C-alpha cells in the first residue's frame, strides 16, 4: 500500500512510471487496474465511494494499492473522523460513547480506533517528529508541546507535520485531513496483521 496525499498526482506518476516499487526498490510501478470499491464514512454522515488505483512492479511483480491518505487501510471511516475521535479522547477527555454519538458510529468502533492508536502512539510520534524535522529544516518552527499523554503527544506531532507542510511546503488548508493521514494516522491505524 502506498499512501498519497494527492490521488490525481499519484495516478499521473503511476501512469508515467515515476513511482518506485516499495517492495524491491528496483522496479517501477505501472498501472494494474483498480482495487475493490470501498465505501468510506466521512465526518458529518456522508459517504464516499472509491476504487483506488493499483500498480504492479515490473521487476518483482508485486502489486500495491495507491490509497488516498484521507483513508486508512481496512477501516470504514475516513481519517478525519478518526482524528476527531482521537483528539476528543486524548486532549479533551471525552468518553467513547459520547464520541460515537457525535460521529454517528458505535462506541465499540471508537474504542477500537483509540486502542490501536494508543498501542502505536510512541512509534507514530517518533516517525512524525523525524518528518517534522525534515519539513522544517532551516525554518523557525516551534516543536510540538507535550500534551500529557502518549496519544496526545503523537497527535500533536502529526498535526505539527501537517501545519509545517501547509506553512513551508505550499500545501493548503484543504489538504489538512489527507496530511494527517499521510504523516501518521492512516498508516498507524491499520489493524494488526491477522485481525
Report each predicted region and the residues it spans:
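Long C-terminal interaction/binding lobes of large macromolecular proteins
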Residues: 1-6, 17, 123-195
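Intrinsically disordered, low-complexity regions enriched in Ser/Pro/Gly/Gln/His and often acidic
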Residues: 25, 105-106, 169
Amino acid at each position: 500500500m502506498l499512501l498519497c496525499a494527492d490521488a490525481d498526482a499519484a495516478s499521473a506518476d503511476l501512469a508515467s512510471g515515476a513511482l518506485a516499487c516499495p517492495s524491491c526498490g528496483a522496479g517501477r510501478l505501472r498501472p494494474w487496474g483498480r482495487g475493490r470499491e470501498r465505501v468510506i464514512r466521512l465526518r458529518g454522515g456522508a459517504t464516499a465511494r472509491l476504487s483506488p488505483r493499483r500498480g504492479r512492479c515490473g521487476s518483482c511483480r508485486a502489486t500495491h494499492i495507491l490509497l488516498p491518505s484521507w483513508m486508512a487501510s481496512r477501516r470504514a471511516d475516513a481519517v478525519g473522523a478518526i482524528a476527531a475521535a482521537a483528539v476528543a479522547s486524548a486532549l479533551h477527555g471525552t468518553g467513547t460513547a459520547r464520541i460515537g454519538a457525535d460521529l454517528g458510529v458505535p462506541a465499540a468502533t471508537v474504542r477500537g480506533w483509540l486502542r490501536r492508536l494508543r498501542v502505536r502512539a510512541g512509534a507514530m510520534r517518533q516517525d512524525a517528529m523525524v518528518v517534522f524535522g525534515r519539513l522544517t529544516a532551516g525554518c523557525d518552527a516551534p516543536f510540538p508541546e507535550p500534551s500529557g499523554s502518549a496519544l496526545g503527544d503523537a497527535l500533536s506531532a502529526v498535526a505539527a507535520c501537517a501545519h509545517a507542510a501547509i506553512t513551508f511546503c505550499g500545501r493548503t488548508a484543504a489538504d489538512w485531513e489527507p496530511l494527517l493521514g499521510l504523516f501518521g494516522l492512516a498508516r498507524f491505524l491499520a489493524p494488526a496483521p491477522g485481525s
